[in-house]
Amino acid sequence: MKIQKIEAKSIVDSRKEPTIEVSVLTQKGKFISSAPNGKSKGKFEANPYIKSLQQDINFINNIKPKILRKLKIEEFKELKEIEAFAEKNIGANSLFALESSILKALAAEQEKQLWEFLSRGKPKKLPYPVGNVVGGGLHGKGFKGKEPDFQE
């Protein structure tokens, strides 16, 4: 797959907080992904951005066309090339948005839906619905003195 252009910009998430959006342009179209920040942060959680959202955006937007031509991504496992290139230059949220956009482009390149591309021909199974029942931690505000001490 030939990537013609990669572009990043700042958008706002559902809580009106800034986050990153990355678009990847190929011959098959434009593929866009974003990665909102969580409200709380675990002690083992990766940093969403290296130093700042704007620094990650600048790094992605300054990827030279010469470098894009060298990146040959045809399969899921070849995303390691992107990770090696971007490591120590962008944070986890930026990398997620970038790789998600590339995955969408790869799926389109093979004329598949994203779920079909990721399942690699394995039989279809219905997903199990997952949802929050208890909104504890930083999400439990508003219970007026009855906030749970834990977060699901």
Where are these regions (language model features)?
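Glycine-centered tight beta-turn/hairpin loop motif at sheet-sheet or coil-to-beta transitions
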Residues: T26-K28
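Acidic, glycine-rich active-site loops and adjacent beta-strand->loop/helix elements
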Residues: V12, N37-K39, R120-K124, V134
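Short beta-strand scaffold segments in enzyme catalytic cores
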Residues: I20-V24
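Short helix/loop capping segments that flank catalytic or ligand/cofactor-binding pockets
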Residues: K30-I32, K43, K141-F143
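Mobile "lid/hinge" segments at catalytic clefts and subdomain interfaces of large enzymes
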Residues: K124-E152
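Glycine/threonine-rich beta-strand-loop-alpha-helix active-site module
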Residues: E111-Y128
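Metal- or metallocofactor-binding catalytic centers and their adjacent structured scaffolds
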Residues: P36-K112
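Short, Gly/Pro- and small/polar-rich lid/capping loops
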Residues: M1-T19
